[in-house]
């Protein structure tokens, strides 16, 4: 039996990464599950005139000529799945005390629950990536099980996606004399509503904070903006509230996802996002396409978890969670995305 260096285990730590669905929690608070495979935008209150621009992707290229506008859409279907291998129940779990070993039935239950947590996390990462991309670009590429990838374009105005260049780069400004406040106010004019929050990635925040004017103006005290403070409190270990810059909250987001075993940041380096915590982000979901779910009367649901066995020689057991997520912005111009340089 494989043993740790100490006979008595005091703690067992899973390999963790900084996943925290900040954009979902801050900007996507409404949820609309549908009983149909398609999401119908006209059935969402206040979105009668909204349409998505949908273009297929072939060999990595967006084919605009074959795309078009639609008010009904088929979300990609995701269904992460694991097998519960009987051999796994015979081995000690990482946090199991070697001097007080559990029985295989207990280990099986633990493995099933861990599988479900991993599957939920896999789907949540897809949702957060859609939400971040919607805010950053006003569009994203959607993929799913047996689903040809398509680009979902919410119609963001080009002026709301800004790249610093031509002498406007903050990295070229004198950090002791230059005040970036005027730049931020100019960027904010492109938003369709009031800006009350700015989200930076860590490198973007370091660049912003390098200006003396920023350090002088940043108010790190709490309590003066109660509603906004409520929105950004208890943000988690992947999010840091830095203070108020005038009447705008400054937040730094270092959330990560895992792709092919590699940890990656949701926000690109040197990103600044101007937005509003009251922006109307929508979590929409197509129906669950599973006969067992239909028999149970579960059609309109963000998730459908299942655990089942197949007969045979030998019998096999699996876990899976199914979902058809599509994150949308009612008004993509409520946000302004700036690539700092």
What kind of region is each of these model predictions?
Residues 13-14, 182-187, 327:
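Short, Φ-rich (hydrophobic/aromatic) sequence segments
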Residues 169-198, 202-211, 215-219, 225-230, ...:
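Acidic/histidine-enriched, beta-strand-rich ligand/metal-binding domains
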Residues 215-341:
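Sequence/fold signature of self-assembling virion shell proteins
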Residues 30-98:
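Assembly/oligomerization interface modules of large self-assembling protein complexes
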Residues 21, 42-45, 51-56, 275-276, ...:
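Pocket-edge structural micro-motifs
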